[in-house]
From Swiss-Prot:
Region ranges (Pore side): 1-175
Its membrane topology: Multi-pass membrane protein
Entry-linked Pfam families: Ig-like_POM152 (PF24312), Ig-like_Pom152_1 (PF24519), Ig-like_Pom152_9 (PF24527), Ig_Pom152 (PF23664), TMD_POM152 (PF24097)
Region (Cisternal side): 196-1337
Lineage: Eukaryota, Fungi, Dikarya, Ascomycota, Saccharomycotina
Low complexity composition-biased segments: 19-37
GO molecular function annotations of the record: protein-membrane adaptor activity; structural constituent of nuclear pore
Perinuclear space side: 132-148, 194-1337
More info: Present with 3410 molecules/cell in log phase SD medium.
Start-end of each Sequence repeat: 390-413, 626-650, 732-755, 836-859, 943-966, 1058-1077, 1157-1178, 1253-1276
UniProt-listed InterPro entries: Ig-like_POM152, Ig-like_POM152_1st, Ig-like_POM152_9th, Ig_POM152, Pom152, TMD_POM152
Name the record gives this protein: Nucleoporin POM152
Oligomer status and interactors: Component of the nuclear pore complex (NPC). NPC constitutes the exclusive means of nucleocytoplasmic transport. NPCs allow the passive diffusion of ions and small molecules and the active, nuclear transport receptor-mediated bidirectional transport of macromolecules such as proteins, RNAs, ribonucleoparticles (RNPs), and ribosomal subunits across the nuclear envelope. Due to its 8-fold rotational symmetry, all subunits are present with 8 copies or multiples thereof. Interacts with NUP188.
Natural source organism: Saccharomyces cerevisiae (strain ATCC 204508 / S288c) (Baker's yeast)
Function according to Swiss-Prot or TrEMBL: Functions as a component of the nuclear pore complex (NPC). NPC components, collectively referred to as nucleoporins (NUPs), can play the role of both NPC structural components and of docking or interaction partners for transiently associated nuclear transport factors. POM152 is important for the de novo assembly of NPCs.
Length: 1337
């Protein structure tokens, strides 16, 4: 062993052991590695005892060591040859290969290791093929072949991968964790490839194995490949190909366009259409016969077209209205030398068309490709509106669309409001309960005969869509029809038509919406008017008010005595209309209206005008006497009539020497009807005072006081009791009220006080005198004022106890008595005293208030039965646009009104207003027997089975179009939200059924033209409606021991205790079940069906399946299952769906099908009764043979014709041998003998493949020759070549013929159709052959 490590004695190439630490070496020495605690087999530590690491000894070592550094470059090259040189003085011997390189080089060691691994894997593949073939595979467990396979190769692979690192082969020595990963990977690979899944590579190997190595025992006793003994194609020889050039075909409307004829040719100047026909022929077309059916009478008419009735098309693209890509399939039609042409046929009538016949110039008929064409009237639509072209805010649009066309139709229309366009599309428009083949999602180019029997679905049907929503803004409104598409695909686009045509043919509908005018009545001063008053009607300025003029105003006038009433109607083109009040009386603003809309009176509506009186003045003079000096001046008492204040002028003259000189001139103002004016000359002398003119604010021009003499007074330079009013403001009284006025008195009482009360509007004066006033203060009680107007309380004089009477000129007290009583009423713009509002919205009820603000209005809210719900009190600062804001429905009644100073009256005829809610959109589930109402908001849909479609029909109430929003919760809890838009008042919700479980459909909200999705308040108050439907799973039942074979004896079939039980697994469904079983009897090839009811996990009368079983094998399968829910599953398949029952008896044998004639290639099958294995002896064509059968059948391949006879039979239980050669069993011997017949053959054209060309209309003869036993039955086909994938040509069967009862050995066929004629099946008196080569291709 020592010499083994002294390798330098034997080779001049240096160290060639693995593990050397040379530069360039791919593997470092273990001396340079870190110490790792692993098994020694993989890695060794430098801490091993020194004696285990021996120094290398060699005679040439020293010289070699000195040259190591020079040899590094050559050492690097030798690395590829697995030679390593170490400059160290000691080497880790445990890192060297286990097998010396002198014995086997490193590269070869690697090669052998890889070859060994591949051998293991090939053997694994061999066992895998056996496993996949279902053959026994030995291992740890006898029955579980897959476990045997996995355990076997887990041990082999693990052992190989675990031991491999021990050899220290470079590049094949792995770390322990890598080895464990390799073992795990191989284990997972073994589990994966041995599973039941199909893999392409394994399938290819299995298929190749079965094809190359599958052999079967024949009746001669030898193992023969079935495919080699019987070549079916050898019995079919020859074929005849007939060619007819060229092929003449025609196709109507090849581009599958849709056509229609306009009902009104004034709009579209079209009265005919040209439909193309695609012709594949070199000859000219002479005659075309069209079948025409009237859409309304279904009457059929054949129309003959000659050359003059159609024309040739150079460019078929001109007929294409839709996508040009459809011409790609006809791209070869336009190549040079093509025989394809296009003709155009002119059609002028609506109806159904198809080509019946086309004849060319040689009087030959062209082949017609079926294509139907329905030409209806083009769809039309119109818009109508029931209202005026000029409408007001609050009116309804009242627009309806009338559509006529072939349903189902689609309408696209636009709504334009002040230039902003809103587009809408309504699809699937059709009458209720309408059925049509056009309702399918795919377009149809041909129709069934049942659909053509009644063409009413091709007629134009009317559909109406009504839009009714309230208008909330002013401006220009327009509805336009953009496009309409019928069910056949005809599209009529109106967008490019001029506006004039759209209006003429009701394709657009326009109207204007105007704002409501508002106005109030005002009283103004007018000096030019006889009454000095004018009436002004002031309108609010609104947008585009100029377009709404003229305004119409209705005024009523009532004279002052309330005796006559006059109505005045005036118009104005401005926002303010001023009228002179020529006559006194009451002026009332009755109503206003603009050019288009009735108006609202938002402020004061009544003005009372009186006739003013010209001011007059009465002057009385009293000397001012002084007890000492006598007269010192004059006191003037001035009495005025008219409306204060008054203005008067005085001139003072001084008399000197008989001359009168103007001494002074002054202008005075009197605020009351009485005034006291004193004049004391400043100097001694005689003076003359002249009152010249008087005026007031109504009569501004001064009025001369005449006669002058009465207004001229003289005085010379020649003090006293007094009284004054303690009132610092004017009194304001309501009509019918009275008041108190305090008076302060000065002087020596008792006093006598005289005062006047004057009506300024009539100049009437009433004097009152109060005597014996003993105090210095007194309160004057005014009378009750029954007439409204301005009054003046004026103090006239006072007399004290000395009897001195002093006239008073103190300021008067002004009393303003209201002429009117405040009133309140609802301001109705229309005769209807009702407003409709949306739920959750607020509306304003306009009020009409008269009086002086602010106002306090009380009203009450009542229900429709008159019961008071609540009372309210509102305050209004003025009478400009007063309105009550309400948000609840009911009756609102005015109760009381008070203005700033007076209690008012309510006008009861206009004191009641009704507010009701617009009808909320709602829906109702249509009653039928498929849905049940559980609670008010919960419905239960009839339970269905998985895969059955169901719908819920809803009736919708409100203003269309509707939007229905609902949630759909699947059984897995997933919730999806959906919305549908419906233009009619009926909707259907489709309920899914793909997954079993409970589906919950929650209808969350419905919106219509009044209540939209933006109405959050309405959305929050909608109650949800829930529809539940349970989808039951399809029942699934399988045999607990699927694929297992049960055994029973024929004698014990009727005794249940001796029968093996048949157990079921209930995988899915609701018990009890009703299951239909099929029992296939191999011996008779007969199948019996049994239906067993009330089956569950504890109750199954399986013994019924054994009834009627005779000797032999019986396959029991489950055909269908019906569970307690009524769900049916008839698609059960797989190995778990079948079990086998073998009924055995004492050794017996009989032919499985004694009535069958056996042929070469068939399987001769005998049924064996007894306990396997069986020993069978038989003869074939006189040659004695024997076989040991381990199954219950003796099956042999009939490899050649002859007679097979059974001579004896023995089983393994009784060891009884049945000798059928015994004369006593001659009848059984004859019954068990079979004659195997040869396969019949057929040849065409003497077995040659012949091509025969004939012209159109000529005929050819096809001769079939037979071999076999008559009578013969022949099946032959005619095939033609068509284009296949990737441009390859392939044959396609166009005709199949079967001829029976041929008693001769030859059969002839006369034909004029092109194609290849060949036989595919032949039957003689006994046997049948099929050309597998033909069917496989």
């Amino acid at each position: 062993m020592e010499h083994r490590y002294n390798v330098f004695n034997d080779t001049p190439r240096g160290n060639h052991w693995m593990g050397s630490s040379v530069s360039g070496s791919p593997r470092p020495s273990y001396s340079s590695r870190p110490n790792v605690n692993t098994t020694r087999r993989f890695q060794y530590s430098d801490d091993e005892p020194a004696e285990k690491i021996r120094p290398l000894r060699s005679r040439s070592f020293k010289s070699t060591e000195s040259n190591i550094s020079d040899e590094k470059s050559r050492i690097s090259e030798r690395d590829s040859k697995d030679r390593y040189i170490n400059g160290d003085k000691k080497v880790d011997i445990y890192s060297l290969p286990l097998i010396s390189t002198d014995v086997l080089e490193i590269s070869k060691q690697r090669t052998f290791a890889v070859i060994l691994f591949l051998i293991i894997q090939c053997y694994k593949i061999y066992d895998l093929v056996i496993l996949k073939s279902g053959l026994p595979l030995s291992g740890l467990l006898f029955k579980n072949y897959r476990f045997n396979f996995i355990s076997k190769y887990f041990i082999i692979d693990s052992f190989f991968l675990y031991v491999l690192p021990s050899f220290n082969i470079p590049r094949l020595t792995f770390k322990p964790w890598v080895v464990y990963l390799q073992i795990l990977a191989m284990l997972l690979l073994n589990i994966f490839i041995s599973s039941d899944h199909e893999f392409v590579l394994i399938s290819l190997i299995m298929t190749t194995w079965r094809k190359l190595y599958t052999k079967e025992l024949s009746v001669t006793g030898s193992a023969i490949n079935h495919h080699r003994i019987f070549d079916s194609s050898a019995h079919f020889k020859g074929a005849l190909t007939i060619k007819i050039l060229p092929e003449n075909t025609a196709m109507f409307n090849p581009l599958h366009e849709s056509y229609c004829l306009p009902m009104d040719t004034n709009l579209f100047k079209i009265n005919s259409i040209d439909v193309p026909i695609r012709i594949n022929s070199t000859e000219e077309i002479e005659y075309i016969e069209l079948e025409y059916r009237d859409l309304y009478t279904n009457s059929v008419e054949l129309r003959s077209l000659s050359k003059k009735d159609f024309k040739i098309i150079d460019n078929p693209k001109s007929f294409l209205k839709k996508d040009q890509s459809v011409l790609k399939s006809h791209s070869n039609d336009f190549e040079e030398g093509s025989t394809i042409r296009y003709l155009a046929v002119t059609l002028q009538d609506i109806g159904f068309y198809q080509i019946k016949k086309i004849v060319d110039s040689k009087k030959l008929n062209l082949k017609i490709h079926q294509s139907h064409l329905v030409v209806p009237y083009c769809p039309i639509a119109s818009i109508t509106g029931t209202g005026s072209n000029d409408r007001c805010i609050g009116d309804s649009d009242n627009v309806s669309f009338e559509i006529q066309g072939v349903p189902p139709m689609k309408l696209a229309y636009s709504k334009i409001v002040n230039g902003q366009t809103f587009s809408y599309v309504d699809s699937s428009l059709q009458p209720e309960y309408f059925e049509s083949p056009l309702q399918s999602s795919k377009s149809k180019q041909s129709f069934t005969q049942g659909e053509l029997n009644d063409l009413k679905w091709g007629r134009n049907q009317p559909v109406n869509i009504n839009l009714d929503s309230s208008i909330t803004q002013d401006g220009k409104f327009a509805y336009k029809i953009d496009k309409i598409t019928d069910g056949l695909g005809n599209v009529v686009d109106f967008t490019s038509l001029p506006e004039e045509l759209k209006k003429r043919y009701d394709l657009s509908y326009n109207f204007n919406v105007h704002e409501v005018p508002r106005a109030a009545l005002e009283e103004r001063f007018d000096p030019k008017s006889p009454t000095k008053r004018s009436i002004a009607i002031v309108f609010e300025e609104i947008k585009n008010w100029i377009s709404d003029i003229p305004y119409v105003i209705s005024l009523s006038y009532t004279d002052a005595q309330d005796k006559s009433k006059k109505i005045m109607n005036v118009t104005t083109d401005s926002l303010t209309k001023v009228l002179q009040a020529d006559l006194p009386g009451s002026y009332n603003l009755e109503y206003i209206e603009s050019k288009f809309c009735p108006g609202e009176i938002v402020g004061k509506s009544n003005v009372l005008v009186t006739m003013p009186v010209a001011p007059t003045m009465e002057v009385k003079s009293f000397p001012i006497l002084d007890q000492c000096v006598g007269q010192v001046g004059l006191n003037f008492e001035l009495s005025f009539t008219g409306a204060p204040p008054y203005y008067y002028n005085t001139k003072i003259y001084k008399l000197e020497n008989g001359e009168r000189k103007l001494y002074d001139a002054k202008r005075y103002t009197s605020e009351g009807t009485r005034n006291r004016f004193s004049y004391s000359p400043p100097k001694e002398g005689n003076y003359e005072i002249v009152f010249d003119t008087v005026s007031n604010k109504l009569f501004t021009e001064p009025i001369k006081l005449e006669p002058v003499k009465e207004y001229t007074f003289k005085t010379s330079m020649r003090v006293k009791p007094s009284a004054s009013l303690k009132l610092h403001h004017d009194l304001k009284l309501c009509l019918g009220d009275h008041s108190s006025v305090p008076v302060a008195l000065k002087g020596q009482g008792p006093f006598t006080l005289t005062y006047d009360i004057i009506e300024t509007f009539s100049s009437k004066r009433k004097t009152f005198e109060i005597k014996e006033i003993k105090t210095n203060e007194y309160v004057i009680k005014t009378p009750v004022f029954t007439t409204g107007g301005d009054y003046i309380l004026s103090l006239v004089s006072i007399k004290d106890s000395t009897g001195c009477v002093v006239g008073l000129s103190q300021p008067d007290a002004k009393i303003q008595v209201r002429r009117d009583i405040p009133s309140a009423a609802f301001n109705f713009f229309e005769p209807i005293k009702e407003a409709k509002i949306k739920h959750g919205s607020v509306t304003e009820i306009p009020l009409k208030l008269s009086g002086e603000g602010p106002f306090t209005v009380k009203f009450k809210h009542m229900d429709y039965d008159g019961n008071i719900v609540k009372e309210f009190e509102n305050k209004f600062q003025n009478s400009y646009k007063p309105a009550l804001k309400v948000s609840k429905e009911g009756l609102y009644q005015l109760v009381d009104i008070r203005d700033s100073s007076c209690q008012g009256n309510v006008i009861y005829r206009n004191s009641l207003y009704k507010v009701s809610f617009l009808e909320k959109p709602k829906f109702a589930i249509q009653d039928n027997h498929h849905i049940t109402k559980v609670t008010e908001n919960l419905f239960s849909k009839e339970e269905v089975c998985q895969g059955m479609e169901g719908t819920v029909d809803l009736a919708l109430f409100g203003s269309p179009p509707f939007i229905l929003e609902y949630d759909l919760m699947a059984p897995n809890g997933h919730i999806s939200t959906k919305k549908i838009q419906v233009a009619t008042k009926y909707a259907s919700l489709k309920l899914p059924n793909q997954i079993p479980g409970e589906y919950i459909t929650t209808i969350k909200a419905i919106f219509d033209g009044n209540y939209g999705e933006s109405d959050i308040h309405f959305r929050e108050h909608q109650s949800e409606l829930i529809i539940k439907q349970t989808v039951h799973p399809i029942p699934d039942v399988a045999f607990a021991d699927g694929g297992k074979t049960l055994r029973a004896c024929a004698a014990n079939v009727d005794q249940i205790s001796f029968l093996e039980p048949i157990n079921l697994k209930f995988l899915q469904g609701e018990s009890p079940f009703s299951i239909t079983f099929s029992v296939y009897h191999e011996s008779t090839s007969r199948t019996d069906q049994y239906t067993i009811d009330n089956i569950d996990s504890e109750n199954f009368s399986f013994e019924k399946l054994y009834e009627g079983m005779k000797l032999g094998n019986h396959a029991i399968t489950i055909d269908s299952v019906v569970d307690a829910n009524g769900c049916v599953n008839s698609l059960i398949s797989g190995p778990r769906n079948q079990i086998l029952v073998s009924i055995t008896d004492a050794p017996k044998i009989h032919i499985l099908d004694p009535s069958t004639e056996y042929c070469v290639g068939d399987y001769v099958a005998y049924q064996l009764n007894g306990v396997a294995p069986f020993m069978i002896k038989y003869e074939f064509n006189g040659i004695p043979l024997k076989s040991k059968e381990r199954s219950s059948q003796f099956v042999r391949l009939a490899s050649e014709p002859g007679i097979i006879s059974i001579t004896s039979l023995q089983d393994s239980s009784s060891q009884c041998i049945v000798d059928f050669t015994n004369p006593k069993l001659k009848s059984e011997f004859d019954d068990l003998s079979l004659n195997i017949h040869p396969i019949p053959s057929v040849t065409v054209s003497q077995g040659n493949y012949v091509t025969e060309d004939i012209r159109e209309g000529d005929q050819a003869e096809v001769i079939f020759s037979f071999e076999g036993t008559p009578p013969f039955s022949l099946t032959y086909v005619r095939t033609e070549e068509t284009d296949g994938k990737h441009g390859k040509r392939r044959s396609q069967v166009v005709e199949t013929h079967k001829v029976t009862d041929i008693y001769s050995h030859e059969y002839k066929v006369i034909t004029s159709l092109q194609g290849t004629y060949e036989a595919i099946e032949i039957t003689d008196a006994y046997c049948f052959a099929k050309n597998d080569l033909f069917f496989n291709n």
